[in-house]
Every structure is written in C-alpha cells, then in structure tokens.
C-alpha cells in the first residue's frame, strides 16, 4: 500500500498537515474549495520565481489566512512590505470579494535543497534547458545530500534525451521507507515541457522519523525511569474532622 497511495495523503494527521484548514456546510464547501484552488494557481503564476514550496489556507469566520512557504521571501515581501499589499489585493480580486480580510504570512524555508517541491522544480528547469537527465539527477542528489537528508528517490519519465520510446528511470540514495507511517516523507511531482514532449518528475525525500514522547531518546548520562508498582495516590477531604 505504501507504494500505491500518495505519500502525503497517507500521512495526514501523523506527519503531514492539511493544506486547507476550515469547516463548511455541504452547500458552501465546493465554493470554498474552488476558491482555494484559484488562490494557489494565482500565487504560483505570479510568484513562480520566488521558489514557493507550499500554500496553506485557513479560514476563521470572515477572515482568510494564507501562509506561503518560500525559498526567497524577499521576492514576495518587496520593499517595505509593498509586495504584501499587492498580494493581498490580488487574492481579493481572485476570490471576487474586496471586503474580505486577508492575512498573509510568509515563511522562509531553512533547508532549500531538502524540500521535495524545490528539488523537483530545479530538475524541471534543468531538463527544460536540455541538460542530460542523468546529470541533472546526479546534481539534485548531491544537493540533497549536502542538505543532510536521510534518503532520496527521484523518478523521471517520458522521452528521455529525445528517445523514440518513452520510459521511466529512477534512482535512490539512502532510506525511503514508504510503509512507515511515522516517517517524514516529503513528496512532490512536477512536469517539464521539453522540445521532445512532456517529462514527469517525482521526488521523495526522507527527513527522519517522528517519535512520540515515550520514544524520545534519553539525554547522555540519564537513567531510565523505573516502572515499579507505585502505590496509587489518595486524596481525602478532612476539612470537617474535629467538628
């Protein structure tokens, strides 16, 4: 099952969070879902050069919150925050409601080369520049390894290097445990429009396992807590004694 299902959808609520966080009735749900899609398409088209990895949308009453995870926040923010106002007005125009309160939060990605979306975008850009796909994959693997990822898998499919018959090739470095639900797997897919046709790109990045509090490793020199038969605590109300 881990190889058949979407890695992010399988881990929602475990290691992945929902990209849209809001509740709605059955009548308004389709409308709000279409709004979210229009907002994401607008942001990706307008700020494609900003290296946007993800767009999270939350709704609270009449307020709309949009969080952008990007590698270059300065492209979005602009000088003295002028870009934020431009983005806010663009979102209001996209959803067709100028009076809607829109709150924008821009988050900078710390490890750019460990992000699956940005790696897939980098591979797509190189393939569109007619760089050999094996060299492109090797360069992407080296960048991810320098970023400290524990595992990486890259798959490219289509008319590779202009071949007459389409095929798929993939490479893997390290561990990519798709069956482990607590494994933090970052997944992304992109398309590259080349002169020979469309190439599909898939990237899996393994960043580690999310452990519960009981499974957290102990500090150096700390002894494990004994699990003996503890006497249960009892609390008695003696406020009325002696009366």
Swiss-Prot record:
Query: What is this protein's function per UniProt?
Result: Binds the lower part of the 30S subunit head. Binds mRNA in the 70S ribosome, positioning it for translation.
Q: Region entry Disordered: which residue ranges?
A: 216-243
**Keywords on record:** Ribonucleoprotein, Ribosomal protein, RNA-binding, rRNA-binding
Can you name the source organism?
Prochlorococcus marinus (strain SARG / CCMP1375 / SS120)
Stretches of Basic and acidic residues bias are at 233-243
Q: Which family does it belong to?
A: Belongs to the universal ribosomal protein uS3 family.
- Identify the coding gene: rpsC
User: What are the TM regions of this chain, as residue ranges?
Assistant: none
Recorded superkingdom: Bacteria
Name of the protein: Small ribosomal subunit protein uS3
For the keyword Glycosyltransferase, the answer is no
């Amino acid at each position: 099952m881990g190889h058949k299902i979407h890695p992010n959808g399988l881990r929602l609520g475990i290691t992945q969070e929902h990209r849209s966080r809001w509740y709605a009735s059955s009548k308004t749900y389709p409308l709000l879902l279409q709004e979210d899609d229009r907002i994401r398409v607008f942001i990706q088209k307008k700020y494609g050069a900003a290296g946007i990895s993800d767009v999270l949308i939350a709704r609270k009453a009449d307020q709309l919150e949009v969080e952008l995870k990007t590698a270059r926040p300065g492209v979005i923010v602009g000088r003295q925050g002028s870009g934020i106002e431009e983005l806010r007005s663009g979102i209001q125009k996209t959803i067709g409601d100028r009076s809607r309160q829109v709150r924008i939060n821009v988050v900078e990605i710390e490890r750019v080369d460990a992000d699956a979306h940005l790696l897939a975008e980098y591979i797509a850009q190189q393939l569109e520049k007619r760089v050999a796909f094996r060299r492109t994959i090797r360069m992407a693997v080296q960048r991810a390894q320098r970023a400290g990822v524990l595992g990486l898998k890259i798959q490219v499919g289509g008319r590779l290097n202009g071949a007459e018959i389409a095929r798929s090739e993939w490479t893997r470095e390290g561990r990519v445990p798709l069956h482990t639900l607590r494994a933090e797997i970052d997944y992304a897919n992109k398309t590259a429009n080349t002169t020979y046709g469309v190439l599909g790109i898939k990237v899996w990045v393994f960043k580690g396992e999310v452990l519960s509090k009981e499974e957290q490793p102990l500090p150096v020199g700390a002894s494990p807590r004994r699990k003996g038969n503890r006497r249960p605590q009892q609390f008695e109300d003696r406020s009325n004694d002696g009366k």
